[in-house]
Design a protein with these regions (language model features):
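Signature of N-terminal electron-transfer/Fe-S-associated modules in redox systems
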Residues: 1-181
C-alpha cells in the first residue's frame, strides 16, 4: 500500500514495504542522494534528516512511521544554499572529504531552530551523534556560531517597538528559511 508523506514541501506517495528505512526510500526510490549511508545502525549521523523539525536518523526509521509527516533533507534546506548554516559552512570551509557533512548540516540546522545562540557545550551535545572521520569538529563548532550570528543579525531589526524578537519568532524565521520545515 502506498505511503503518503511530504518531502521538502512536496507531497509524495511511495509504494514500498512498510519496514523499508526512510534512507532507502530517499536514495533508491526517489533518487535523492544528498543524504548519506554510513553505518545503518544510528551510530554515525550521516543519514540525518528532519522529521517534523526533529533531527532523525533515517537509516533506522521505517517509512511507515513517517506517513503523514514532513521530511526535510539536505536538498530541501534551502533552494539556493542560502540557509544560514549552509552559508556558514561555506564561509568556514568546514568539509574535508564531505561524506558526513549533509548529516552535520541537518543536525546543526535543527539545533539552531530550537536554540538560536547555543554555547560550545550545547553544540557539542547536539552534534555528538554526528561522527566525522576527517575530524572537522572545530570548524563545525565555529560554523554553528557563525550561522547563529548571521541569523541574529538578520532577525534583530524585525520589531519596530524596540522589543527583541521572541524565541518563537526566531524559530519561525529559521523555519521559513528552510531550517525545520
Ligand atoms: S547511517 Fe544512519 S546513523 Fe549511520
Ligand atoms: S568531512 Fe570527511 S567524514 Fe566528515
Amino acid at each position: 500500500m502506498a505511503i503518503q508523506l511530504t518531502i521538502n514541501g512536496k507531497p509524495q506517495s511511495v509504494d514500498v514495504p512498510p519496514n523499508m528505512p526512510l534512507l532507502w526510500v530517499l536514495r533508491d526510490t526517489l533518487g535523492m542522494t544528498g543524504t548519506k549511508f554510513g553505518c545503518g545502525m544510528a551510530l554515525c549521523g550521516a543519514c540525518t534528516v528532519h522529521i517534523d523539525g526533529e533531527a532523525t536518523r533515517s537509516c533506522i526509521t521505517p517509512i511507515s512511521s513517517v506517513a503523514g509527516k514532513k521530511v526535510t533533507t539536505i536538498e530541501g534546506l534551502s533552494p539556493n544554499r542560502s540557509h544560514p548554516v549552509q552559508r556558514a559552512w561555506i564561509e568556514v570551509d568546514v568539509p574535508q572529504c564531505g561524506y558526513c557533512q549533509s548529516g552535520q548540516i541537518m543536525s546543526a540546522a535543527a539545533l539552531l531552530a530550537k536554540n538560536a545562540k547555543p554555547s560550545n557545550s550545547e553544540i557539542d551535545e547536539a552534534m555528538k551523534g554526528n561522527i566525522c572521520r576527517c575530524g572537522t569538529y572545530q570548524r563545525i563548532r565555529e560554523a554553528v556560531h557563525r550561522a547563529a550570528a548571521m541569523h541574529a543579525a538578520s532577525a534583530k531589526p524585525a520589531r519596530l517597538d524596540g522589543a527583541l524578537p521572541t524565541d518563537d519568532a526566531l524559530d519561525k524565521q529559521l523555519v521559513e528559511a528552510g531550517g525545520a520545515a
